[in-house]
Amino acid sequence: MDIDLNNQTDNNELIVEDTENPKNPNSTNIEDVGDIGDIEDVGDIGDFENIKKTSVKKISFSPCVFLDLTESEISKYKEHIDKIYLEINQTDYFFENLSLSVKTNDYTNFFNRLGQPHYLLMQKIDDKEIVGSTCIIMRMYVFKCGDKLSRIKYWYISDTRILQEFHKLDLNLKLFKQMYHKLRLKSNRFYTICVDKYQSYTDHLMNKLKIYFNVEFKIDKLLIFLVETTLLRSIEKYFICAYGDIKYMLVPNKTYHIGNKVIKNIYHMQHSRYSSDKSSNISELPINSMVMFCFPEKSPLESIMENLHIKSLITATILSVGMNFFDWHDILTSDIYQI
């Protein structure tokens, strides 16, 4: 039974969630998927028969409630989610992921390509207006063990948008606590990315999380670059060596100002296995376009960029638990569309 003392209604009514204990609470969430031929089931996030569905659908705190959407309810609220993605910008928000965000209904297809989305809507209690949305994605990391492939479940806070007037309510912490309690039963491995202009708030959040959760949060630095396509063509071989097969996806409805230049064609580097049908090879990109990519600090690619006098556009912080041995190159290249 999970009792969150910080999720109380106006009448001081506690919200209680009943769950069954996992069969093996010390499990590392590593699953053997058999021979190579079994890899097609990688999209399945596992057997959850030991997890009892919560009987509480609304987690109250004044003046809003969280609407925790099940898979069947996502279509019911899709109109509200679409409106938020089209009208609410991520600017000046902690989990904004650099504001280079999806502005069209393509966000649905993108999230579905990466894994199994979980949506949490923020709704005003008085007039039922939807004032915010977040998407958390459950994914699989696939790796080879001898002659077999195995998979590990993990999740991450991918995208959050909240109306400006509600930022002051510190919904970040409430949101994080709710989703952590919900998803830790499925996997105790997760990460999220926070831009460094919010460093003071990152420190505040970390101090709070240490109070509520008996886990060790790891911090990694992320370097984000934006370079001209003509330059990237000359150094793409280094990324192919690090990432394998890569393609490029256009960021819709996004312009970027660099000095006196206005860049309208911005592409994101991705692993081709996560790319949509609209992704392109570098030879197909317009000459006047630019490409965004990222990699962790102290990566071998960092010294290559330094030797070429290519500086990062901005830095970010990766907050993670249980992700120490993961290949950040693999994970972040597939997620770069949201950064």
From Swiss-Prot:
It comes from the Viruses. Residues 1-30 are annotated as: Disordered. Residues 1-12 have a biased composition (Polar residues). This is Uncharacterized protein L340. It comes from Acanthamoeba polyphaga mimivirus (APMV).
